[in-house]
Amino acid sequence: MIQFLIAAPRSGSGKTTVICAVLTALQRRGAAPCAFKCGPDYIDPMFHRSALGVESHNLDLYLSSPDTVRTLYARYAAGHGAAVCEDAMGFYDGQGLTTRASAWELADTLALPVLLVVQPKGASITLAAELRGLLQFRTPSHIVGILLNDCSEALYKTLRPMLEAETGLPVVGYLSHLPGCAIESRHLGLKTAGEIVDLQQKLGQLADALVLDWAQLAALTDRPAPATPPLAAPCAPLARIAVARDEAFCFAYAETLDALRDAGAELVFFSPLRDAALPENIGGLYLPGGYPELYARQLSENCALRAAVQEAVQNGLPTAAECGGFLYLGQALDDTDGKVYPMAGVLPGSGHNAGRLVRFGYAAMTAKADSMLFRAGEALPIHEFHHWDSSENGTDFSVRKAEKRQWECGFATANLYAGFPHLYWAGTALPRRFVQAAQHFLKHKG
């Protein structure tokens, strides 16, 4: 099975463009690839799934233990002919100024070969010096080959023999310069696939422009498929849980949804933008993150759904709301033009544009008291990434970053979790507790 991680010395090297080209080319070759994203980013896996039709999952060594990451990788790689992981930031860049949760640590944990993407513009033999440093910085580096990005055929033919002689690494190919195929971004990263004009045409052009020695790549990256972990026998659904899913609420980890299903949840999806009512016979409500600020007017104009959510939560429906979902439960939300729109009105506080990233990055969140999802003193790794803030962020959890910065956040009761932190539910007790709360609610309602 072809298995490798695409990495780069730094952000902005074109990893996303390269992985789109590689995955499209693998599809054309009938390899049935799957994709993984190193780290907590929601948008790249969404892009892989919706744009390329490729199954894609997150692997994060801060949010998950090494054993959980190995299990998830084996589970989701099963049945595929190729597994391709995408780096985040630079190859060795992890939490703070360490390699923790870096792409290198992921490659080391999974014993994955690494294909290093290098942009040769503005340098020649200096590239070899940089590559030698990357090879020697940690042992083993797991780097097995080089792919030149944004590179002409002539430059590739010039640089390849020099780079191979200086580094001992094979240069397996190159991706030509295609300025018209750039993948646009917004304040939280890539635009979603549905927003990019002529996307399929661009992906085809990228695959056409990829020159790769496939036989050499296979020789460098072919590994035995990971042993598929045993899964519990599927049981009859224990409770129906409604999950918000549309353009405004699109940041839900696939692994979290599968963990809920594994715990006995029947997931039913609905749109806070379009549906007038919550799904019937539900015992729980999950409001993930996304872009509610881009759709504040439409969300507000759906008065029936806002009222239904308010009534359901106030009547004790077990509810989990992260980041954008948390903003939706507030009193009001500013859109990108600063206009204020009423929201569900379940929680105090209103959402506004802070004009910058707020409390960005990894942290550890500790519960102050028992609640639906947490037990007093229980700590969970979290991630935050948002430009909007709330006038009332809650005080039911203490949060601490590695550099010792601390703050309070979140609302937690017997039937509610709501806060800015994104939670990674796989490998935790959260799915089981949420399903149990949903069961209890259904048993005792009315």
Predicted regions and their residues:
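ATP-dependent carboxylate-amine ligase catalytic core
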Residues: 2-110, 118-142, 150, 154-157
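Structural motif
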Residues: 5, 84-86, 115-117, 147, ...
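Internal gly/pro-rich beta-alpha loop/helix module
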Residues: 124-233
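Acyltransferase
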Residues: 193-237, 245-249, 415-446
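Phosphate-binding active sites in nucleotide-utilizing proteins
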Residues: 239-314
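Cysteine-nucleophile active-site neighborhood
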Residues: 267, 292-370
